[in-house]
């Protein structure tokens, strides 16, 4: 049974490899994997999308065992930096979509509750990212100011 106020809804998903070792079928060197990651990022893919593409199209289950570095660390080393962490950005986009829906359908109470849940997650993540230093201490979640991220 799914956990309440989470978006999994009991769906089955793929499982990460149990032992993060380099599989025997991988033909790529660590340098080639790094180049693939950087190339995909420059083409506009988010880190999670890069991982999916590497898994599905190149047969690379995990980047870290091969390169010894996390995918986002590789991107930082090559000067590719994201304004906001990806999970926070996706939640903000979801909240903005719900707000747009509520402008057209103001009596949709289920969506209003959904917006409350999403914004609660946003506030928890903002607190966490401020604490670990990924967001500046003066960052404030403001839907109107962040509306440019809805694209």
Curated annotation (Swiss-Prot):
Belongs to the universal ribosomal protein uS15 family. This is Small ribosomal subunit protein uS15. Part of the 30S ribosomal subunit. Residues 1-16 have a biased composition (Basic residues). GO terms for biological process: translation. CDD domains: Ribosomal_S15p_S13e (cd00353). GO terms for cellular component: cytosolic small ribosomal subunit. Keywords: Ribonucleoprotein, Ribosomal protein. It holds the Pfam family Ribosomal_S15. One of its GO terms (molecular function) is structural constituent of ribosome.
